Regions:
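Short, surface-exposed amphipathic charged segments that create phosphate/polyanion-binding patches used
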Residues: 252-256, 310-312, 409-417
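Catalytic pocket-lining loop regions of alpha/beta-barrel enzymes
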Residues: 295-299, 304-335
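Short amphipathic alpha-helices and their capping/turn segments at secondary-structure boundaries
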Residues: 224-232, 311-316, 348-352
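Terminal accessory/targeting
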Residues: 1-213, 217-222, 284, 288-289, ...
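Acidic, His- and aromatic-enriched active-site or binding-groove loops in soluble protein domains
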Residues: 234-244, 291-307
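Catalytic cores of extracellular degradative/oxidative enzymes
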Residues: 171, 185-283
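Acidic/polar loop patches that form or flank catalytic/metal-binding clefts of enzymes
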Residues: 272-273, 293-297, 393-399
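Conserved beta-strand positions in the central sheet of alpha/beta enzyme cores
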Residues: 238, 275, 294-295, 361-363
Length: 465
């Protein structure tokens, strides 16, 4: 077995690439399909068995019985690089009927008449359009972390193959933060634009930083004074689509024409981040975006017009672009589609993502919190985030700061020097050394003491065989 490191695993954990080795069965299926690894991890791609499913469901083949572990490495019945890529970039959705919608005419008609539709009527139409969302089994609702779970399973297999108790890695967040949260405000129409100043007051009153995604054309005028008013208060400005008509990713020619203007607006606005309107997306085209990061891909998209989801609660790279996935239910969906002002769903998602050390990416539109009931729910959310920063070591950051950190972490190295593991590279003074350990068939994380070096015997990476 010719075993090598897994790029997706070492990039995710930022662990030494010389310790764990994996190989892929040479005889994979010719077609891609759904299967699972263990009870809970749905995969999509080729496998060494031909019994793959066209749709996700309860009776998927479990490929874990075909995994071989020995002292030299792990032989896998699938290519994990392919599986991770297919999930993150939503390639499973393009090939699966339950995610596709033949609704171009309906969408065109809706966005043509939308300016004259009252909100109550739009909510009614959206509920009809989204009917059946709760029957979708994959990705998991209300948060999906299939990619993260898959990589954790691979880490466990790798540790077992070498008889290791633990392996060092660079912790996910700076200063040892347990998790990260970003607040983003998509400004859709002029009433929302007019409310931005009051919204900044609310954010500031709870000490929550935020970014404002601005639509450059059609929806409202974008004066330099408006942008400067946001910027000088310490908030971030990003570009949101071009004109918010839902057509950006409809045709490649349309996208290529519009993205040139979008990129120009990015430079004019001094924006390093982008988000598409209504979270329409095609990650295969993201290389045309002249931005450092994107925020257009949901973790799970059952309640979005474009179904699918990237199946992770962690940032990842799409080429040279950092993707900060939308991991929290949008305010519009929560308030206007589900009719929920209790924050119970947000609380459920917050607790889940915090427990799994992930990224909470909120979208709260100024347009949809004009009513007092919605404002009260938003204030409650801000209060929760403020308390978690103080009590639960939550990193509250601007999206651009998360982008910068994720790039710095990706460029860092974990080296063994003398008798110590050392983190090196720009930003390493904020990095924390951690280790992943096998305990009762679970992967458990723990942090080393502050500092960027630790003695090897503290991490117990010596093999048993």
């Amino acid at each position: 077995m010719n075993a090598d490191p897994l790029p997706s695993l070492t990039k995710y954990f930022k662990c030494p690439d010389s310790i764990l080795n994996f190989a892929v069965n040479e005889h994979l299926s010719t077609r891609e399909g759904f299967f699972r690894l263990g009870a809970d991890t749905v995969c999509y791609g080729r496998c060494s068995t031909e019994r793959l499913s066209k749709e996700p469901g309860p009776d998927l083949l479990d490929a874990s019985g075909n995994v071989q572990v020995n002292g030299t490495g792990v032989l896998l019945p699938f290519d994990p690089e392919e599986i991770v890529r297919n999930l993150r970039q939503e390639r499973y959705a393009a090939d699966c009927a339950q995610y596709r919608r033949n609704d171009t005419i309906i969408r065109e008609f809706y966005y043509l008449l939308r300016p004259w539709m009252p909100l109550s009527f739009r909510k009614h139409l959206q509920r009809i359009y989204l009917k059946g969302w709760d029957k979708l089994s994959f990705p998991k609702w209300p948060v999906d972390r299939t990619v993260d779970h898959l990589l954790q399973q691979l880490m466990m297999l790798g540790l077992r193959s070498k008889g290791l108790e633990s392996i060092p890695f660079i912790w996910f967040w700076p200063e040892g933060a347990n998790a990260c949260a970003i607040m983003t405000h998509d400004v859709e129409d002029n009433p929302g634009k007019l409310f931005c100043s009051q919204l900044m007051d609310l954010d500031e009153s709870f000490g929550v930083p935020a970014s404002f995604q601005i639509v450059p054309e059609v929806r409202y005028s974008v004066e330099p004074e408006f942008l400067e008013g946001i910027r000088k208060r310490g908030f971030e400005i990003n570009v949101q689509d071009l004109n918010h008509d839902g057509r950006l990713f409809q045709e490649k020619a349309t996208f290529e024409s519009r993205v040139k203007k979008i990129n120009r607006y990015g430079k004019e606005y001094q924006a390093v981040g982008f988000r598409s309107a209504i979270l329409y997306r095609n990650q295969e085209w993201f290389d045309h975006l002249d931005f450092e990061y994107d925020m257009s891909v949901p973790s799970v998209a059952h309640l979005d017009p474009q179904r699918g989801g990237c199946c992770t609660v962690m940032p990842y790279f799409v080429g040279g672009l950092v993707e900060l996935p939308v991991t929290m239910t949008q305010d519009h969906t929560l308030f206007n589609v589900m009719g929920d002002f209790t924050n119970s769903l947000w609380q459920q998602q917050i607790q889940f993502i915090h427990r799994h050390n992930g990224l909470m990416n909120f979208i709260v539109h100024p347009d949809y919190i004009l009513r007092q009931q919605a404002q009260d729910a938003f204030k409650s959310l801000l209060g929760v985030l403020g308390r978690m920063r103080q009590e639960d070591n939550l990193w509250l950051a601007l999206p651009r700061d998360v982008n910068r950190w994720w790039r710095q972490r990706d460029a860092m190295t974990l080296s063994f020097r003398g008798s110590e593991w050392c983190i090196e590279g720009e930003g390493s003074e904020r990095a924390r050394l951690a280790f992943a350990s096998l305990k009762e068939d679970q992967l458990v994380y723990s942090l080393a003491e502050p500092g960027n070096a630790v003695h090897a015997n503290e991490l117990n990476t010596s093999g048993k065989n």
